């Protein structure tokens, strides 16, 4: 994981509002513009395919964290989905 990717990942637990997610999405967009080669899924098609796959298997992500999958989506969960879609294969 690159240093920039680690910075993005570190922001996720503090995302508790729509405004926080807006800021995070802006940071993801900027990261794509400046670090495109670090993205496994730089095209919209690849990004959405990875998003679909990650959402389908995100139970393992939460199990690895020792947490249940939230019953209702949260701003933080949406940020996890977006961030994972950047790199999920």
Where are these regions (language model features)?
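Amphipathic alpha-helical packing elements
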Residues: 2-56
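Intrinsically disordered, low-complexity regions enriched in small/polar residues
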Residues: 26, 49, 63-64, 80
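Amphipathic alpha-helical interaction segments
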Residues: 32-35, 58, 62, 85, ...
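N-terminal accessory alpha/beta regions
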Residues: 50, 54-60, 64-67, 72
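Amphipathic alpha-helical binding modules
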Residues: 64-89
